[in-house]
A protein has these predicted regions:
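Short secondary-structure boundary segments
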Residues: 29, 55, 94-95, 150
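Acidic, metal-binding active-site segment of PIN/NYN-like and related structure-specific nucleases
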Residues: 141, 146-154, 164
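Divalent-metal (Mg2+/Mn2+/Ca2+)-assisted nucleotide/phosphate chemistry catalytic cores
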Residues: 69-147
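Short amphipathic alpha-helices and their capping/turn segments at secondary-structure boundaries
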Residues: 38-46, 78-79, 84, 163
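Conserved small/polar residues in nucleotide/adenosyl-binding loops
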Residues: 169-171
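N-terminal catalytic cores of NTP/NDP-binding nucleotidyl/phosphoryl-transfer enzymes
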Residues: 15-62, 67-70, 118-130, 137-138
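Active-site glycine- and acidic-residue-rich loops that bind
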Residues: 30-33, 149-158
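Positively charged, low-complexity intrinsically disordered leader regions
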Residues: 1-22
């Protein structure tokens, strides 16, 4: 298992893998991994030559700074959990600056009104933050396939809408 912290590093690796015609599966996470995440990783390993797991607590999807500060950051534990699945996992654990530079802001997206329903009523800008990080991570990792849990159905639908609207990859 190799952990990359810089997008330039992961870009180099991805370009090399793509030049070998290998398929890349991607499981974006905010860490604090559990069995649901591991099942996505296992599925990705079955369906792709390579699997990349990102572990990144995204500040733009938190509307409350306190919630962001309290969010668990358990990289060592997460890596050990991933090792129980396979040693052939690439981990991308960037810093906020690596992903956003000095401008930590969200892009604005239209999700066919989904962003204003359910959770979106109470967390203004949350889904713009989700859309921003998913788009940025896809641009960095350049996966063929991506895997998302279904526990948060609204977020899954938001991501599916983003992928469709921007003509991104298969999820």
């Amino acid at each position: 298992m190799i952990i990359y912290y810089k997008k330039e590093e992961i870009n180099t690796v991805v370009e090399e893998l793509k030049s070998q015609q290998l398929t890349i599966g991607f499981v974006p996470t905010m860490g604090a991994l559990h069995e649901g995440h591991l099942s996505l990783v296992k599925k990705g390993l079955q369906q792709n030559d390579i699997i990349v797991v990102s572990i990144f607590v995204n500040p733009t999807q938190f509307d409350n700074k306190e919630d962001l500060e309290k969010y668990p950051r358990t990289l060592d534990r997460d890596v050990n959990l991933l090792k129980t699945v396979s040693d052939d996992i690439i981990v991308y654990a960037p810093t906020v600056e690596d992903v956003y530079g000095k401008n930590i802001t969200s892009s604005k997206f239209k999700f066919n009104g989904l962003e204003f329903e359910m959770e979106g009523k109470f967390r203004e800008g949350h889904f713009d933050g989700v859309g921003t990080i998913v788009k940025r991570l896809f641009e960095i990792v350049k996966p063929n396939n991506a895997y998302f849990g279904e526990k948060d159905y609204q977020q899954l639908r938001i991501i599916q809408t983003l992928v469709k609207n921007l003509s991104l990859i298969h999820i």
